[in-house]
């Protein structure tokens, strides 16, 4: 009898929001453990937990993964234990 194939669990990322985002969307909670394979998955999970947050993260932030800033990071892979930090975009002038 063949053995069932088990799906590989997604890595768990340490997600950090700025205090402004957390006050607006998560009642002040700034840090989260999120199971995800890509940054897109992180954003979708954050939006599932806090409706409306995903769109805001996509449009109004830049993201740093383990200290490296990514302007376009939607499909960046997530590694176990990595830190994902959402940074407010700076407006030029």
Regions found by a protein language model. Give the residues of each.
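Ubiquitin-like/PB1-type beta-grasp interaction modules and other compact soluble beta-rich domains
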Residues: 1-92
